[in-house]
Amino acid sequence: VDSDGRVDELVPVMMRHGVNAYLPFEVQAGSDIEEFRRLYPRLGIIGGLDKNALADEAPPAAMHRELDRAARLLEHGGYIPGCDHLIPPNVPWKKWCDFLGQLRRLTGA
């Protein structure tokens, strides 16, 4: 299910009715994919990495925190890494390509 905003109250209801994966888990709405993984270990999680960590004004450590988060979820399985929504125009192309390259290394793609 693609659901914008905060979905923590919807997930258990939707799972009871057969939904087994969600995206994009918006960080700005308070969604924390590591918390969702802890609460719902069988839920497929897609996205959930903070797109603003890639913004031109964001420090490099912000992107590395998101990559570390992706690595932790990938270890568990049931996770497709990606950003928490469309990539905004303040994300430089070079930074985006670097981020994607590092995600590829994490996933073995």
What are these regions, as identified by a protein language model?
Residues V1-A109:
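Active-site loop segments of alpha/beta catalytic cores
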